[in-house]
A protein has these predicted regions:
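Polytopic transmembrane helical bundles with strong interfacial aromatic enrichment
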Residues: 1-196
């Protein structure tokens, strides 16, 4: 039973990260132009896949925590890594709401990403960086057995915060460098945005 739950948990994580990284790459390639209808459909499909995978991760994660507690009720919740992973997944989930209701409508709008106002570009870049860092760090916590009962919550979250800040800096610099060739934007004017 536990092995099957772990398998489903890992499979959902792999599907999510793979889908997100491929979609990020596709968005980067289209940064100078408006997305086509096919690209928007692919983005919507990816969002649905990641949402379903996140639901599976929550269900299997809670199941694994329950199993772990019954196996070792005296000490299981003293493992600070569990609370750190829970915190990261909560942040990841809340950021998913931001991506869905803020970033997504901006990305599929009638402007290329690099034509959006600077504040929108920064928020899209930062929310994307937070998503990638959070997914990868949550997965790392899942395999970091040497952190069990050895690192405290604050230390783990400090590492996470450092990675998030690094992700924000990288996202900012990537967007800044991408704007250097802004005059060469190729806008796809043949797409009717009212049908999106």
């Amino acid at each position: 039973m536990k092995t099957l739950v772990v398998y489903a948990h890992l499979l959902a994580a792999c599907v999510s990260i793979g889908s997100l990284l491929l979609q990020d790459l596709a968005l980067w390639r289209s940064r100078h132009r408006v997305l086509t209808q096919d690209e928007i459909s692919a983005l919507r499909n990816t969002a649905n896949i990641v949402f379903m995978a996140l639901v599976v991760l929550w269900v299997t994660g809670i199941t694994l925590v329950t199993i772990g507690y019954f196996e070792n009720p005296q000490e299981y919740f003293s493992n600070q890594k569990i609370w750190a992973k829970f915190s990261v997944v909560v942040i990841l989930s809340l950021n998913g709401v931001l991506l869905h209701f803020y970033s997504f409508p901006k990305v599929v709008g009638n402007k290329a990403i690099l034509e959006l106002p600077s504040v929108d570009q920064k928020l899209i870049g930062c929310s994307g960086a937070l998503s990638t860092v959070s997914w990868l760090f949550a997965c790392y916590l899942g395999i970091a057995r040497n952190w069990n009962y050895s690192l405290d919550y604050a230390s783990i979250m400090l590492v996470y915060a450092g990675l998030v800040v690094t992700g924000f800096i990288v996202a900012h610099e990537v967007m800044r460098m991408a704007r250097l060739d802004l005059p060469g934007l190729r806008i796809n004017k043949g797409v009717d945005r009212d049908t999106v």
